[in-house]
A protein has these predicted regions:
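A glycine-rich dinucleotide-binding beta-alpha-beta segment and adjacent secondary-structure elements
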Residues: 394-476, 480
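Conserved beta-strand-loop-beta-strand element in the redox core of flavoprotein oxidoreductases
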Residues: 196-224
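Conserved N-terminal/central alpha/beta ligand/cofactor-binding core
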Residues: 11, 69-184, 188-193, 314, ...
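An anion/pyrophosphate-binding glycine-rich loop and adjacent beta-alpha core
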Residues: 268-390
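Beta1/beta-strand and adjacent pyrophosphate-binding region of the FAD-binding site
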Residues: 35-47
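Glycine-rich loop(s) and the adjacent beta-strand/alpha-helix scaffold that form part
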Residues: 212-213, 217-219, 225-294
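N-terminal secretory signal peptides and thylakoid transit peptides that target proteins
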Residues: 1-15
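Conserved small/polar residues in nucleotide/adenosyl-binding loops
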Residues: 488-493
Length: 493
C-alpha cells in the first residue's frame, strides 16, 4: 500500500516536472527574425469588442488591421439577439422607469456572487448610456424606440432592441465604419502563435492566411509584426467540447451551444502558453430559454424570454412553476436541469394579451415561430396541458395562483418582479414552447487591468504590447453574466 502510494507520488511529481519544463520551453518559442508584414495595432477577432477596438485605434491614428479566423466577420456578435442594456435611455424614460448606473452595478455584482472586479463593474454601469449613444451617433445603429425589455437578474426593464432584432444591426454598422476608415477586416486568418521578445513584450504573431475552419494546417503561414499593440478579442470557447469539459465536466458533447462554430479554445491555450494570467475559466454560462427543436441559438428564445419570462410564466410538465422567471440565467438554467433530471420538461407559456410588447419589439417573429413549430398556439389552457401531458387541474391552479400575484403585484412563491404592463393570463389564444439549456458564455478569461492590459501570470504585471477585451477577458461578470450587458461590457473596455 505504502509502496504504491510512493510510486504514485513519484510518478505525479515526475509528470509535473515534465509539464513544467515543457510549458517553459513552449513559452520561449523563438521570435521570427523577420516579418511578412507589420502594423501598429493588430486586433484578433471581429465581434463587437474587436471591431470597436479597431475603430478607436484607427481614430487614434494607428495603422490597424483586424484578423478573423472564420470566413465571415461578426463572431457570436452577429447572431446575438440585438439587445443591450442602456440605463436612463429614452425608452426607459418613455415608460416611466427609474434606473441608475448604481442599480445596474448592484445587479451585476449580486448576480456575479461578488466575484466580479468592482472597478470594472462600475465602469460598465457608468458607460451603459454613453455606449448606447455611441452606437447611435457614431455608427448610426437604429433601435426600436417603443419598447424596453427586462432580462433575468435585472431589477428593472433596461434593455433596448436593435430595429432588426439582431446583433447584426450593430456589427454591420461597425464594419461599414471600418471600411470608410480604411481598416481591413481579413477573414480566414487563423492565429497560431503569439511571440514575446526577451524583454517580455509581444512583438509579433504567426498566422495561417486562407485558413479553412476547422481544417488544421490549412492556409499559408505568415508572420506579422506588432509595433504598438496586439488586441485579443477572440471570444469564448462554448463550441470547444474538450476544453469546456476540462473546465466543467457536466458540459458534455450532447449539450448544444448557442455559439457559432468558431467559438473554440485555440487562443485560450496559446495565451496560457505565453504566460497570460487567466481566472474563472470554469464559470461557463448556460442559457435557460433556448428551444430543443432548434440547433444553436435559434429564435425560440425570443418568445420564452421576451414573451413568457417577462409577461407569462414557466412551468414544468407536472404543471407547476419551478423558478422565478426573471432570475439570473444560472439560477434558471440550473432549475431547468433539476427538472430534467426528474424526467420533466420546462415549458414557457403566455397569452395573446401579454405578447403586445413582444410583437412590437420583434414584428413577425411569432408568426415565424408558429410556422416552424417551435412555438404552438392553443385555444385553451387545457389544450396546453393535454399536448404536454400535464395534469390539467394542477396547471389551472398554477395559473390561478400566478394571476393573483399579477393582480397583487407581489409574487409570494418566487418573489418575481412583475412588469407594470403585465395583465392576468385569462383568455386565449395561448402560446407555449419547450425550453432546454444550452452552453452560451464564458465569464472567466484573461486577467486585465483597467487599461485592458493583459497581466503576466509570473509577475502580476502588464505584458507590454498586449491588450484584451470582450468575452476573452475576466473580471466584469463574476459567476453570472446578466443578459443584455455583453455589448455594454465590450464597448466600455
Amino acid at each position: 500500500m505504502d509502496l504504491n502510494r510512493r510510486s504514485l507520488i513519484k510518478g505525479s511529481v515526475a509528470a509535473g516536472v515534465t509539464a513544467l519544463f515543457g510549458t517553459a520551453a513552449q513559452a520561449s518559442t523563438k521570435v521570427p527574425a523577420k516579418w511578412d508584414e507589420s502594423h501598429d495595432v493588430v486586433v484578433i477577432g471581429s465581434g463587437f469588442a474587436g471591431l470597436a477596438a479597431a475603430i478607436e485605434a484607427k481614430k487614434a491614428g494607428a495603422d490597424t488591421v483586424v484578423l478573423e479566423k472564420m470566413p465571415t466577420a461578426g463572431g457570436n456578435s452577429i447572431i446575438n439577439g440585438g439587445i443591450l442594456t442602456a440605463t436612463c435611455c429614452p425608452q426607459q424614460l418613455k415608460h416611466g422607469i427609474k434606473d441608475s448606473p448604481e442599480l445596474l452595478a448592484f445587479d451585476m455584482l449580486a448576480a456575479g456572487l461578488y466575484m466580479n472586479q468592482p472597478e470594472k463593474v462600475k465602469l460598465v454601469a457608468k458607460s451603459a448610456l454613453s455606449n448606447y449613444e455611441w452606437t447611435v451617433k457614431e455608427l448610426g445603429v437604429e433601435y426600436n424606440l417603443e419598447v424596453i425589455g427586462q432580462e433575468g437578474g435585472h431589477s428593472v426593464p433596461r434593455y433596448v432592441f436593435t430595429k432588426n432584432g439582431s446583433g447584426s444591426g450593430i456589427v454591420t454598422k461597425e464594419l461599414e465604419k471600418l471600411k470608410k476608415m480604411g481598416v481591413p477586416v481579413r477573414p480566414r486568418c487563423y492565429v497560431e502563435r503569439i511571440f514575446r521578445d526577451d524583454s517580455g513584450r509581444v512583438v509579433s504573431i504567426q498566422i495561417r492566411e486562407g485558413y479553412r475552419f476547422p481544417k488544421a494546417g490549412s492556409g499559408k503561414v505568415k508572420t506579422i509584426g506588432v509595433k504598438k499593440g496586439l488586441v485579443l478579442c477572440y471570444g469564448g470557447f462554448s463550441r470547444d467540447v474538450d476544453y469546456r469539459m476540462m473546465q466543467d465536466p457536466k458540459l458534455v458533447a450532447k449539450l448544444d451551444s448557442t455559439n457559432q462554430p468558431g467559438a473554440t479554445a485555440e487562443l485560450w491555450r496559446e495565451t496560457s502558453r505565453i504566460g497570460c494570467a487567466q481566472v474563472q475559466n470554469d464559470w461557463i454560462q448556460c442559457t435557460p430559454w433556448n428551444s430543443p427543436k432548434e440547433k444553436g441559438m435559434g429564435l425560440g428564445w425570443t418568445f420564452s424570454q421576451s414573451g413568457a419570462a417577462e409577461f407569462g410564466l414557466w412551468v414544468n410538465t407536472a404543471g407547476k412553476r419551478f423558478v422565478d422567471e426573471l432570475a439570473n440565467r444560472k439560477v434558471r438554467a440550473d432549475a431547468i436541469m433539476v427538472e430534467q433530471n426528474k424526467g420533466l420538461h420546462a415549458v414557457a407559456i403566455c397569452t395573446e394579451a401579454n405578447l403586445k410588447s413582444y410583437n412590437v419589439a420583434r414584428p413577425g417573429m411569432l408568426k415565424k415561430l408558429l410556422e416552424s413549430g417551435v412555438v404552438k398556439q392553443y385555444k385553451t389552457l387545457a389544450d396546453i396541458a393535454a399536448d404536454y401531458k400535464m395534469p390539467a387541474d394542477v396547471l389551472a391552479k398554477t395559473v390561478e395562483t400566478f394571476n393573483k400575484a399579477v393582480k397583487d403585484r407581489k409574487d409570494p412563491e418566487f418573489n418575481r418582479i412583475m412588469n407594470p404592463e403585465q395583465v392576468p393570463l385569462v383568455d386565449g389564444p395561448w402560446y407555449a414552447a419547450e425550453m432546454s439549456p444550452k452552453v452560451h458564455h464564458c465569464m472567466g478569461g484573461l486577467v486585465t487591468d483597467m487599461q485592458c492590459r493583459v497581466m503576466d501570470i509570473s509577475t502580476s504585471k502588464p505584458i507590454p504590447g498586449l491588450f484584451a477585451a470582450g468575452e476573452a477577458t475576466s473580471g466584469v461578470h463574476g459567476a453570472v453574466r446578466l443578459g443584455s450587458v455583453s455589448y455594454t461590457h465590450l464597448r466600455a473596455h
